[in-house]
């Protein structure tokens, strides 16, 4: 193994970095993650005579007609504090005329400037301030207000706003351009509101002012309670000594560390947030980006990532990187079956839905002064998606974060290998391993749990290891969004009404994708059954049917659907933890037994509980190819082999009493040889690029994936490394890359 003597100051920095990750700090000001600095910079202290506001203000923001004035008065009564309405108490008194008269007098631009200057003179503490609808369009005045308060956005449905404005005989608002409709103008000013709010009240249609005021109090309480949303290991045991050794983590810490130090996976300590039916209804006509922001705001505390920053990340991830404007559209296949198309991202697989966002979350959460290496095991699609996602970081972040992807050299399709190699960038490398995915995944876990090695990297190179596999909570979280969005799309397209149940069928290997659907149900999406679809490596199907997870005498089979050629299903542990009422000791026992004896069995009560929501079956190679052929002949639609596995199992298991959403996890062109075999195309001995162009000529659905064609061209120019299946060898490769990227660059 390589060693390199570094100077004393680097060792000191590295040791401080490591301790910032591994030691639970007691004070918010001591924490080196953004959660602490964000709280310190905002200066929001909420302990004073008023239980919520103290000497700070609650600042209500929203468009005209959102109810700010009425809600502000109710809050003032509830909190016993002063209420300031900017329109009537500030602007009209300063101008000696109404805001509408002033607007008529000076016009839009001058009005906004004079309004902003007037608000800059406002000085208040311990008050509720109801802004005008146009205050957020003046940056300086909003910064002034934010310094001494929490800005709460009253996000009221547009239909309600327009109805209220009509009843008030208002047909124009500040900032409305000539010829623009009221609806379009309201949509435009929303962009300003999203820039400033600290917390959002997502108002149901027709909600009373009293109900909205109660929600304001709820979001302010959540905002001030920075310790309320923590994460624990699935192997957490409620004992004093254990709590000291393995304390709860904040979201930022869970993201950076990736894997819990006791070998378990991070999960929320408390229940998942749940949206009401009315809140879900507000999202039916929303864009994917809007849905993502509302849902992820509920799951990530603003002390970890402020709402405005989270919104920027989501816009960056999904704004222009997907070939379809809907990001994850739903297409009717036939009968009661619908395809959730998850392959429009830059690498053509469902992994892009997480890995276009997760790198930005990770880069924001890491503490200063350290370098990070993301270790990834891939069964095919994850590797290229991780490499692509982290390549989109800004220059400064790329200098601090590097990616090493290990993939089974002979266990992915030729196209997947080409794509992984072609996705390498200056801060990301691919290494083929002469073994299978399970070895790669197990090896990475062993590396993470090797405290001598991780400590050595921290001290010698100032570098910390982390993960981007679905064991990382930030990888799993964005997947909840597309399962929820798929249901909302069915409602939006009027196939169902909200509240009607659906089944979800997912080709399953590592259990993360289907687990995200479970979490979507916990948030309020009415999913009836989860259909787990396996290929010939059907250990999960057998487990769901019997409760016995048995790896003895099993050998991993290479199939047409390599991304689910997995025997050790990591995320199953998270679901078992939920079913077992968060029994961390049971999880530790089960997975220690799996490690030592290659099997475990859960008790009958848990099997029955599992089978209440889960059904499972598997698909042979012949059935997979037949499904591709028959579906294409019937509809002109080409399924990739993983989606074909799900289609076969959905046909077997679904009772057709409700719609079934089939997760299509990859674009078919990534598996051209299997597709050509299924469709009876004889020209199999072609290059991967030629196969891709040949399939494109069929004019089938879905359309060709242009980014994949481009990636194939890049592959020819890139080298990659191959190593034997030895954990120490993988460590050595990781260390060499750390030297090449971080150490030599700094010398």
Curated annotation (Swiss-Prot):
Superkingdom per UniProt: Eukaryota
Keywords: Pyridoxal phosphate
N6-(pyridoxal phosphate)lysine carried by residues: 351
Pfam families given in the database record: SKI, Thr_synth_N
Cofactor(s) needed for function: pyridoxal 5'-phosphate
Disulfide partners: none
Signal peptide feature range: none
InterPro entries: P-loop_NTPase (IPR027417), Shikimate/glucono_kinase (IPR031322), Shikimate_kinase/TSH1 (IPR000623), Thr_synth_N (IPR029144), Thr_synth_N_sf (IPR037158), Thr_synthase-like (IPR004450), TrpB-like_PALP_sf (IPR036052)
Protein family per UniProt: Belongs to the threonine synthase family.
PANTHER family xref list: THREONINE SYNTHASE-LIKE 1
Protein name: Threonine synthase-like 1
Native organism: Mus musculus
């Amino acid at each position: 193994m390589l060693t390199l003597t570094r100077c004393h100051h680097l060792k000191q920095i590295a040791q401080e970095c490591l301790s910032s990750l591994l030691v639970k700090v007691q004070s918010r000001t001591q924490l080196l993650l953004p959660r602490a600095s964000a709280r310190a910079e905002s200066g929001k202290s909420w302990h004073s005579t008023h239980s919520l506001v103290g000497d700070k203000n609650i600042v209500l923001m929203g468009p005209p007609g959102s109810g700010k004035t009425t809600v502000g008065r109710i809050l003032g009564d509830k909190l016993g504090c002063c209420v300031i309405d900017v329109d009537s108490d500030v602007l009209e008194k300063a101008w000696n005329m109404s805001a509408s008269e002033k607007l008529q007098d000076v016009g839009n631009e001058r009005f906004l400037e004079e309004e902003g200057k007037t608000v800059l003179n406002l000085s208040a503490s311990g008050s509720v301030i109801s802004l005008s609808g146009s205050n957020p369009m003046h940056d300086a005045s909003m910064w002034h207000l934010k310094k001494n308060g929490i800005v709460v956005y009253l996000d009221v449905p547009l239909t309600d706003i327009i109805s209220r404005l009509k009843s008030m005989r208002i047909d124009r608002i500040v900032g409305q351009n000539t010829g623009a409709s009221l609806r379009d103008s309201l949509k435009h000013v929303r962009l300003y509101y999203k820039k400033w709010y600290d917390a959002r009240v997502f108002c149901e249609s027709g909600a009373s002012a009293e109900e909205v005021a109660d929600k304001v109090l709820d979001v302010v309480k959540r905002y001030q309670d920075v310790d309320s949303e923590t994460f624990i290991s699935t192997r957490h045991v409620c004992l004093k000594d254990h709590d000291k050794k393995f304390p709860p983590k904040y979201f930022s810490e869970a993201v950076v560390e990736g894997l819990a130090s006791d070998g378990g996976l991070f999960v929320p300590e408390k229940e998942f947030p749940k949206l009401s039916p009315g809140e879900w209804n507000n999202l039916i006509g929303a864009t994917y980006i809007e849905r993502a922001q509302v849902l992820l705001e509920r799951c990530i505390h603003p002390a970890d990532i402020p709402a405005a920053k989270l919104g920027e990340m989501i816009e960056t991830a999904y704004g222009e990187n997907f070939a379809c404007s809907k990001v994850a559209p739903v297409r009717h296949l036939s009968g009661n079956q619908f395809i959730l198309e998850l392959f429009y991202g830059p690498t053509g697989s469902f992994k892009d839905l997480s890995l276009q966002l997760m790198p930005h979350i990770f880069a924001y959460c890491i503490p200063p002064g350290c370098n990070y290496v993301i270790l990834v095991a891939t069964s095919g699609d994850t590797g290229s998606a991780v490499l692509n996602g982290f390549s989109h970081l800004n220059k400064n972040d790329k200098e601090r974060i590097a990616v090493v992807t290990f993939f089974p050299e002979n266990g992915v399709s030729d196209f997947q290998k080409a794509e992984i190699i072609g996705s390498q960038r200056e801060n990301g490398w691919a290494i083929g391993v002469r073994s299978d995915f399970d070895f790669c995944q197990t090896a990475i876990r062993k590396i993470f749990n090797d405290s001598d090695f991780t400590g050595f990297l921290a001290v010698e190179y100032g570098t910390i290891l982390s993960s981007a596999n679905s064991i990382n909570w930030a990888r799993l979280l964005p997947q909840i969004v597309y399962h929820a969005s798929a249901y909302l799309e069915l409602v939006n397209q009027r196939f169902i009404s909200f509240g009607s149940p659906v089944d979800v069928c997912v080709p399953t290997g590592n259990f993360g994708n289907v687990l995200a659907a479970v979490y979507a149900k916990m948030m309020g999406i009415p999913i009836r059954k989860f259909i787990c679809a396996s290929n010939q490596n059907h250990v999960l199907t057998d487990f769901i049917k019997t409760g016995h997870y048995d790896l003895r005498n099993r050998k991993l089979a290479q199939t047409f659907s390599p991304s689910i050629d997995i025997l050790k299903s990591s995320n199953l542990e998270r679901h078992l933890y939920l079913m077992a009422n968060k029994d961390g000791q049971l999880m530790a026992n089960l997975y220690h037994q799996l490690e030592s004896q290659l099997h475990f069995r859960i008790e009958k009560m848990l099997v029955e509980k599992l089978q209440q929501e889960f059904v499972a079956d598997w698909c042979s190679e012949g059935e997979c190819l037949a499904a591709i052929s028959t579906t294409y002949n019937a509809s002109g639609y080409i399924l990739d082999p993983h989606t074909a596995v799900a289609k076969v199992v959905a046909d077997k298991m679904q009772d057709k009493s409700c719609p079934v959403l089939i997760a299509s996890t990859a674009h078919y062109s990534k598996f051209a040889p299997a597709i050509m075999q299924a469709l009876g195309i004889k020209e199999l001995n072609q290059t991967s690029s030629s196969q891709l162009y040949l399939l494109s000529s069929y004019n089938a659905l879905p359309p060709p994936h242009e980014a994949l064609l481009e990636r194939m061209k890049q592959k020819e120019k890139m080298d990659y490394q191959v190593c034997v299946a030895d954990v120490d060898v993988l460590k050595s490769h990781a260390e060499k890359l750390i030297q090449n990227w971080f150490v030599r660059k700094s010398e």
